[in-house]
Swiss-Prot record:
Intracellular or extracellular location(s): Cytoplasm, Nucleoid
Record gene name: ebfC
Annotated protein name in UniProt: Nucleoid-associated protein EbfC
Effect on the protein of changing E85A: Forms homodimers, but does not bind DNA
Keyword Cytoplasm (UniProt): yes
Length: 99
């Protein structure tokens, strides 16, 4: 069966529109990664930019440096995982060929 080049171009235009829509949806994603019973909270957008870091000062003085660093790392990893999951949900079934 021969492929019509015009149909192919129409499909590519549709794919481009889908990708543009997905990019818009991803840019709207905002998640919060949390660690240590919410001692550290990190807000991240869909492009993996950290928008806000919150530290519950009530617990801050009681933490040693290693524990605090571990909580920051855990909160960042939690936020990254949540962004990836949101992207996966928003792109599922939209892109062709398993893109």
């Amino acid at each position: 069966m021969a492929v019509n080049p015009l149909d192919f171009l129409k499909n590519m235009s549709s794919v481009k529109n889908n990708i543009d829509n997905i990019k818009k949806e991803i840019s709207k994603i905002t998640v919060c990664g949390k660690a240590g019973s919410n001692i550290v909270t990190i807000e991240m957008d869909g492009e993996f930019n950290v928008k806000k870091v919150s530290i519950n000062k009530e617990f801050f003085d009681d933490l040693d440096n290693d524990a605090f660093e571990q909580m920051i790392k855990s909160a960042l990893n939690d936020a990254v995982s949540k962004v990836k999951e949101e992207i996966k949900l928003k792109t599922m079934g939209v892109l062709p060929f398993g893109m």
